[in-house]
Amino acid sequence: MEIWYAEIINIGNEILTGRTINTNASHIARRLTSLGYTVRRITVVRDEIEEIVSAFREAINRRPRIIISTGGLGPTYDDKTNEGLAKALNIELELNEIAYKMLLEKYSKLNIEITEERKKMAIMPKGSIPVENNAGVAPGILIVYQGITILATPGVPKEMEDVLENFIKKYLKDRPSVKYLETSFLLEGVMESTIAPYVKQLVKKYDLYIKTHPKGQELSKPILEIQIAGSSENEAEIKERIQKALEELKEIGVKLGGTIIQS
């Protein structure tokens, strides 16, 4: 089974100072995983050109199928993703006419003039395709470089989600053939350390990702969410493996004195 790797780059000082929770990374990771990609790395960098350049170049050197970034596409002085991406790819920046028309249409409806700051949101690496942003103003930037699809999205979560979905629907034609499935259940009364060796055995037996997520306290009233996940080109086959592992894990949990409280 061929693995299609993906990487995520989040750009913004506000993430690194802890002011903003990085919900964008989790949303993109879930979305890409649902499409069959394996997200290999999530990188967070400051709003600094050299940091942005380094993040893109390092990701490109690892040769993922797709790189998605968030943040830095707005009109302010510290929005530098377009410049950083262009420098990382050694491609000149240009005023993208399609993106500029998108901006003109949005601002003209409100009788707002296009300033240099607003015009900046249409400046992209040469050869880029602007991706519509129906939840805001700044369009996403789509470019294919050395066979790697790169999508830069805004940092505002609603705008990022809109641009991401527009990209998936309109432009992401070549996708992994694998199907990712997962399920989970809650087990009460069994310590994570007690069930750990059984989980290890089942991971090897079924070739699945099985993860215990503690929801209670190990030494008082332990509650575990047990996640079972896997990928395969054969959906029926992966469903069967997950179901067998699920049933076996529940049996083990009960034998260890636990109670299934949610399945």
From Swiss-Prot:
InterPro entries: CinA, CinA_Arc, MoaB/Mog-like_dom_sf, MoaB/Mog_dom
SMART domains given in the database record: MoCF_biosynth
Protein name, as recorded: Protein STK_14130
PANTHER family linked: NICOTINAMIDE-NUCLEOTIDE AMIDOHYDROLASE PNCC, NMN AMIDOHYDROLASE-LIKE PROTEIN YFAY
Family: Belongs to the CinA family.
